[in-house]
Swiss-Prot record:
InterPro entries, per database record: GrpE (IPR000740), GrpE_coiled_coil (IPR013805), GrpE_head (IPR009012)
This protein's encoding gene: grpE
Assembly notes: Homodimer.
Domain of life: Bacteria
A GO cellular component annotation in the UniProt record: cytoplasm
Primary location: cytoplasm
UniProt source species: Thermotoga neapolitana (strain ATCC 49049 / DSM 4359 / NBRC 107923 / NS-E)
UniProt record, GO biological process: protein folding
Similarity-based family: Belongs to the GrpE family.
Name under which the protein is recorded: Protein GrpE
Entry-linked SUPFAM superfamilies: Coiled-coil domain of nucleotide exchange factor GrpE, Head domain of nucleotide exchange factor GrpE
Keyword tags: Chaperone, Cytoplasm, Stress response
Pfam families: GrpE
Signal peptide bounds: none
Amino acid sequence: MSEKEKKDLSQECEELKEKYRELEEYAKRLKAEYENYREEVAREKRELIKNANEYLISRLIPILDDFERALNQKDHEESFYEGVKLIYKKLLNTLEKEGLSKIQVGETFDPFEYEAVERVETDDVEEYTVLEVLESGYKFHGKVLKPAKVKVAVRPRKKDEESPDKKE
């Protein structure tokens, strides 16, 4: 084998090694892209399932509200009451396992979690204090699905504020 043939074979071998390294790098990039794609698809699937559950649970909340109203009635037969109470607890427990939670009522009105349906003028408590929950509110995985309907304390209006059009 001549020197030139050896040199040509050596050069060809180096070119093939370089091509091999390029193909190896390309395969690694493809593998990484594929793994990223799989993770993204799995994340989208989880989000789709979560959104479907959110839709279903938001449709079940009115049933919870009806149960609460029935349970708050004073005059009904004890066995009926206990049955409704049991169903309510089971339904609430099932929904909580899926990510539903009741909005806990704090002391100060939060417009992101409460809907003020009634304002009560009073000096007895601090302004914007939640006085009473009229209807429970719910979150699903931290997102408010239904705000709690509440009575909120406001400062009494002064006499001259009550009728601004009566100024002379």
